[in-house]
Amino acid sequence: MESLRIYNTLARDKQTFVPLQDGVVRMYVCGMTVYDYCHVGHARVMVVFDIVQRWLRTLGYNVTYVRNITDIDDKIIRRAVENGETIKSLTDRFIKALHEDADALGIQRPDIEPRATDFIPQMLGMIERLEANGYAYQASDGDVNYAVRKFANYGKLSGKSLEDLRAGERVAANDAKQDPLDFVLWKQAKPQEPADTGWDSKYGRGRPGWHIECSAMGCTLLGEHFDIHGGGQDLQFPHHENEIAQSEAATGQTFVNFWMHNGYVQIDNEKMSKSLNNFFTIREVLAQYDAEVVRFFIARAHYRSPLNYSDVHIDDARNALTRLYTALKDVTPDGAELDWNEAYAQRFQAAMNDDFNTPVAVSVLFELASEVNRTRDPALARQLRLLGAVIGLLGREPRAYLQQAAGAAAVGALEAAAIEAKIAARAAAKQAKDFAAADRIRSELLEAGVALEDKPGGLTEWRRV
């Protein structure tokens, strides 16, 4: 059997995975900033790295999986001030919501889930090491900054050079910085900020910059050199680039061996963005779709590829998952142990060992389901159920799932038909120049979570929001 190979962003290639310590894997994934509900992009990060850690454990590794929580940040402070509540009240509420969303999606809790505010001393300790090593300075405005030009390998993860970055500079000018690209390690507290947003230090009262949080938590919990660091593609630069610069300048050694990044989530082929009003929270999605369907939708795309979210694609995922459960409906699985020597299991394992290639692994499940349908073989049914379980799927009683799925499909079809009927009524109102009625129908649909977009030629498209 092939060894596990992982696409390493640092090397820009697949590499055979060899842990630093035989049989042990230490992995850190950047988690959420808890000032709002988690969105579909967060769901992808959680599902992708849940599958990664599940597969590493399946291979027999002793895994320590850390996924942090950022609970101090400018966005958090602004939201708490807007709401008139404390930082802790706000972050506790959204951490609870995060856990509810993750549990619904079948995400196994990380072994360690550190909050940034519990590691302020470690962050300050790393900043002091950077200052002692000549990589940090306190500016005239009180902020402590990282001197990017001092780190010779800056840009090695993203492939960006300092010259290219300066040529395309979009960072707001700050006369206190030695270089516009320098980034903040410790932010000086401002008089108007709430008292619960700062900590005393030798640099004055303030709070950590975002990048130093992950460096300090990773090094403290997993050691100064560990195996895997993961996160969304959007974090590759500058966040992960800055983590490398901080950590390696502080410790004098390699920070991480393998860097993994999952692809963007797109909404109807456009990048998900609040500015485009195509932004969906996990709870909005789960109000409409079964959580296992959403997990399956994410799992059957390769983690490095863009993921296009749409009602059509989710409906397709529901139908596909239904086919897998249908194969198990009338066949009782024989036994509770996976036979890894069986041909389908061997192919599944080969796919997962090829950079966690879940699309191929899922295709093996469908071939196996077809064979179960043909033979009614309890041993093959066992293989199907247990291989699905490896990636967090097919854990429910088939008839219960199928009954629920049939009901959801019927409701979805009825809703779609009702929406189309309202669109037709709106078109008729416009034709009759009753624009008040047409606007009223649009408003009613929007209140029901359906946005309309008029296209050339009199066509109207709709989507759920």
UniProtKB/Swiss-Prot annotation:
Give the enzyme's EC designation: 6.1.1.16
Q: What is its main location?
A: cytoplasm
**SUPFAM superfamilies hit by this protein:** Anticodon-binding domain of a subclass of class I aminoacyl-tRNA synthetases (SSF47323), Nucleotidylyl transferase (SSF52374)
Underlying gene: cysS
Indicate whether Repeat appears among the record's keywords: no
Q: Which GO terms describe its biological process?
A: cysteinyl-tRNA aminoacylation
> What chemistry does it catalyse, as a reaction equation?
tRNA(Cys) + L-cysteine + ATP = L-cysteinyl-tRNA(Cys) + AMP + diphosphate
Motif 'HIGH' region is found at 32-42
Name the record gives this protein: Cysteine--tRNA ligase
- Protein's cellular compartments: Cytoplasm
Q: Subunit composition?
A: Monomer.
List of residues binding Zn(2+): 30, 214, 239, 243
- State the Pfam families in the record: CysS_C, DALR_2, tRNA-synt_1e
Motif stretch ('KMSKS' region): 271-275
So which cofactors does this thing need? Zn(2+)
Organism source for this protein? Paraburkholderia xenovorans (strain LB400)
Q: Please report which protein family the annotation says this sequence is part of.
A: Belongs to the class-I aminoacyl-tRNA synthetase family.
Cited CDD domains: Anticodon_Ia_Cys, CysRS_core
GO MF terms listed in the record are: ATP binding; cysteine-tRNA ligase activity; zinc ion binding
